Amino acid sequence: MKISLEGKTAWITGAGSGIGRAAVTALVKAGVKVGLSGRRHEPLKETLAAIQSLNGEGILAPVNVADSEAVVAAAEKIRAELGEIDILVNSAGLNLPKRRYSEMGVGDWQMVINVNLNGAYNCIYAVLPHMRDRGDGLIINVSSWAGRHDSYVAGPAYGASKHAMSSMTATINLEEGRNGIRCCSLEPAEVATEILDRRPIPVADIERARMLQPDDLGETIRFIAEMPAHVCLNEVLISPTWNRSHMGGSDWFPGPPS
């Protein structure tokens, strides 16, 4: 059984591209009003234009999710203009081109953790009390395959941030399920988004075509959101059928240094 999302309000971070933008499109088609957050204004404006072409309703709330005070202000803006936030999609994230222990500095590590993990927490912190007061709310944390399976390709900082995000999801359900709040850890394997452009080893077009596509994740997010309130999808682990982590290859399982 699916519920109607018509008239609900969603806050989507990382909404300027990739999974975040695909989530916006899928939810707007279901009648959801959306608040769009991200660091880059121009991509957010493009997403807003796409919403308007669908006759949807949305507003811009640009923010660096690592800035906790700015995040609270963004949430307040969305509530003031669109109503209480029913759905939070934490899709903001990044990775490093130089991601090995031998290449990273302390600042590199902290940047990944501050955006991927602390940024998600900041957004949760901004909505959780209001969801608790209403006895209802859905949080979707876009984690990663690397948040469930250790990955050489993802690197240690990204992997640590996503493992922690998956754990944060579980503890929200442990503490807040009794308050009507549901949290899902969405853990996709490789998705053909612009984050691939930061890979140390370039990804060929033929490989990108075999990967999950952003729209696959957008529709999955809509599916999660359309579950009735008594259903909590704690975790959704999703991969392409041609899963490169199962196939092997020098970028996934490198040999010893030459």
Predicted features, each with a name:
Residues 178-179, 185-186, 205-247, 251:
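C-terminal helical subdomain
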Residues 99-101, 108-110:
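Substrate-binding pocket helix/loop in short-chain dehydrogenase/reductase
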Residues 124, 161:
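Active-site helix of classical SDR
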Residues 149, 171-181:
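Active-site-adjacent segment of SDR/Rossmann-fold oxidoreductases
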Residues 9, 16-18:
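Conserved glycine-rich cofactor-binding loop
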Residues 41-42, 62-74, 106:
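The beta1-alpha1 cofactor-binding region of Rossmann-like NAD(H)/NADP(H)-dependent oxidoreductases
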Residues 144:
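Residue(s) in the substrate-gating loop at a strand-loop-helix junction
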